[in-house]
Structures are given as structure tokens and as C-alpha cells.
Amino acid sequence: MNALKGRDILALGFMTFALFVGAGNIIFPPIVGLQSGPHVWLAALGFLITAVGLPVITVIALAKVGGSVDALSHPIGRYAGGLLAAVCYLAVGPLFAIPRTATVSFEVGVVPLLGESGTALFVYSLAYFLLALAISLYPGRLLDTVGRFLAPLKILALAILGVAAFLWPAGPIGTAQPEYTQAAFSQGFVNGYLTMDTLAALVFGIVIVNAIRSRGVQSPRLITRYAIVAGLIAGVGLVLVYVSLFRLGAGSHAIAADASNGAAVLHAYVQHTFGSLGSSFLAGLIALACLVTAVGLTCACAEYFCQRLPLSYRSLVIILAGFSFIVSNLGLTKLIQVSIPVLTAIYPPCIVLVALSFCIGLWHSATRILAPVMLVSLAFGVLDALKAAGLGQDFPQWLLHLPLAEQGLAWLIPSVATLAACSLVDRLLGKPAQVAA
């Protein structure tokens, strides 16, 4: 089979959409919508660039090089590329994404019943990760069965929630918090990092390409074309989900004005609109979705690291589950606070890598361009991260007042300047000399 039928392409698009939509993704648009008030759509535009546009572009970039993040990062060298891949796996694994699945389901399903309690979170997360561990050690056919059952149910629930957000808003749009009044677009842009979908796309891009190849497609041109179509289908789905959740959050000021995270906003709206039965349904759905996501990420991380470390798959599953359990006990709000500086630091070089991968043919040596620009973007990303963590008080004033620094995008101008300088040097040096055998 050399070409996919229409229904196969559509199925590929839905699969890509399902890969991106984890339970954690639905908690960020509501809180941004709530806090941005009348500036909600400007904040949404910034959010959609990093939470939808970049992941879709990343899928396309990976498809052009065969789906592997190692191939995409080849110009920066084997060790730097391996470090980048490891950081992506750790971020979408035990550092943030896996623990977040437990805290999201706890916030939505348990907190409304028992309230905030460290003991309750400890007991819940222990049971949660023991179950995730058991399934990850012996996935068998259980995960496939749950996945086939869960995917349409989750899409249906999101569709109902999205329609309800526009038909039955909880109230009028409230006032914006100061940071959104001053810079709604950039606040949305940086908050889009929290979905971690660009990092996730770097990890599972190979899954999408392999899914195309499994249908008998071998032509690189067709693989790239189908990956682009799948990415666009997923992108449209993500935009619809996010826009409806922004509207939900923006209209929830009357019922969730003091919410500290999106899970609280979401629960308040569902409780207000659908009552206790709807709230229980949402809690059960998100708990199941979170568990499936946790198992999938645990398996993926264990399979990746067992090929690179002298540890067995089973040992790594146990280590990953145990570490995720410990991190999850920070709680959702604290976990998000910790993740913001880290993601602020590592996102810029990933953005640079993906964006410049489309321009490789313009230079004599991609290494001369990518390595310096990524290094500069990382350095200034770390600067933004330190400021986001509240550690920038002692910085020189010129560092605090770089172009776009107030918007958390201090890395952008230096990266563009480095790109221009390196492009000029590359043009002057010409093609690298071939090493004689």
C-alpha cells in the first residue's frame, strides 16, 4: 500500500490529536481565561502559538527527517542531541508530566470531596502510582482496551464541555490580573509552554511516522505529506478545545474568582452547570484519562532509557513510578510553579531547533548556525527562568531591561542577532573541507 485512503488519514489525524490531548492540557486555558478577563482572546492568541502552532510545526519538522529527534538534532552533535532528547523525555516523564497526571485527577476528583490535605494527596498518589506501576509492568491488552474505550469518551466529554461553555457561561467576564493587563499576549505565549506539547512532539514524532509506515507508506514525500495533514487535523482539534476552555474560564469569575489553578476553575464550572452527577462523571473521566497518560508516558520513558542505561525495563518502571510519586506530593499548584522556570529555560532552544530545521539548505554548515543560536537562546532562556523563579533581583539593570525581557522573551532578539552573525560567518567560510579518509 503506497497511499492512504481518506478514512486512514482522518484516523491518523485523530490519533495525533489524542497524543497531544492529555488531561493536564485542559487545566491551563481555564485559568488563563479567568485571569486575563477582557484580554482573554489576546492571551489566547499567544497561548495557541506555543500550545498548538509549535507542536504541529514540530511534527512536520520531524516528518521531514524520518521522525527521530536524534536526526533532527544531528547538526548540533551526538552528545548535545542526546542531552536534548533526554531532557525532553524527563520533562514529559517523571519531572513534570507524569506527576501532573496524579495531581490533576486529585484536584478534580478528591479535593471537592475531602478538601486540600497533604495526607489525602499522599494516600491517593500512592494508590494511583501503584496501579500505574502494575499496568506499566504488565501492560498486555488492558491498556489498548482502555485506550479504545477512553478516546471517544474523552472527545465526547470535551465536545459537550466546549458547547456548554459558549451556550451556558457561568457569568460575565471578570477583571484581568495586572500581568495580563500589561502584556496579555506574552503571558499567554509563556503559559503555552506549560502544556509541554512541543517537547512531547519531539518525543512521539517517531510514533506518528511509524504509524504512517505501518500502513505500507514508504515514500518520504508521502510520509511528510500525511504527517502535515495529521498535524493540521490535530491542530484544528486543539484550537477548538482550547478556545472553548478559554471561554469557560473567562466566564467563571463569579464562581471561581479565587481559584489557584485550572482544575479548580473546571470543577467549579462543571458543578455549577451540570450538578453533582456531572461533576462525578468529569472526575472519573479525568482520573481514567490521567492514569492512561501516566502509564503511556512511564512505558515510553522506560523503553527509551533502558536502551541507554545499564538498567532493565522493569527496574526503570519502578524508579520512574517511585520518583513521580514523590514529585506529585508537591501538589498541582506548586508543581506548576516549579515547572515554569524549567520550561522557560528549555523551550527557547527547542523552538530554535524546530524553526531553523526548515532552513538547513540555506547554509553551507548547519552546525555553524544551529549550535551557537541554540546556545544563546538557552543562555537567555535561563535568564528568563531565573527571573520567573524570583531570583533576578541582583542582576545588572541592563539584563533586566533587555528587549522583550518584561514579556519573558529576552532570548528572542539575541537569538536573531546570533543567527544573522553566524549566517554571515558561514557565508564567508564557505563549505567545510572534506576530511580525507
Swiss-Prot record:
It is a multi-pass membrane protein. The chain crosses the membrane at residues 9-29, 40-60, 79-99, 120-140, 155-175, 189-209, 226-246, 277-297, 316-336, 342-362, 369-389, 399-419. It is found in: Cell inner membrane. It comes from the Bacteria. It holds the Pfam family Branch_AA_trans. Belongs to the branched chain amino acid transporter family. This is Branched-chain amino acid transport system 3 carrier protein. It comes from Pseudomonas aeruginosa (strain ATCC 15692 / DSM 22644 / CIP 104116 / JCM 14847 / LMG 12228 / 1C / PRS 101 / PAO1). The gene is braZ.
